Amino acid sequence: MHCPFCSATDTKVIDSRLVADGHQVRRRRECTECHERFTTFEGAELVMPRVIKRDGTRQPFDEEKLRGGMLRAVEKRPVSIDEIEQALTKIKSTLRATGEREVNSEMIGNLMMEQLMSLDKVAYIRFASVYRAFEDVSQFGEAIAKLQK
């Protein structure tokens, strides 16, 4: 790996350890030329299935869109970034585990709601109200009743 400081081509690994529940390797490296140290993260690049939207169009899976939806749902709620990242990892793992090349956006929305339900009930209601396009108070009541079961 090239040194980000001096662009030398030779660096050595000082320390390696697993992070993100074993899904990534964190490596501390040192440049043999300028002796600067830096950190790299290594993870498997796995192909995500394409998403079939409600209108039938297909698009590549967009992790940032998923993260943005979750962040909006948990905004100003007591949910840590680590919990959000773990939930996103579970959703992506479930999607990969289907073995399908394409998945419906509805499946992704349902997986998101499952994760939000276990993280924070208010965030779940927020997301469900937009995702399910609630139009009146009775639909909120039904969603809340589902949580209380």
From Swiss-Prot:
Short name of one Pfam family: Zn_ribbon_NrdR
The protein's required cofactors: Zn(2+)
Any GO molecular function: DNA binding
Domain ATP-cone: 49-139
GO biological process, one term: negative regulation of DNA-templated transcription
Keywords from the UniProt entry: ATP-binding, DNA-binding, Metal-binding, Nucleotide-binding, Repressor, Transcription, Transcription regulation, Zinc, Zinc-finger
Role according to the record: Negatively regulates transcription of bacterial ribonucleotide reductase nrd genes and operons by binding to NrdR-boxes.
Family: Belongs to the NrdR family.
Protein name from the UniProt record: Transcriptional repressor NrdR
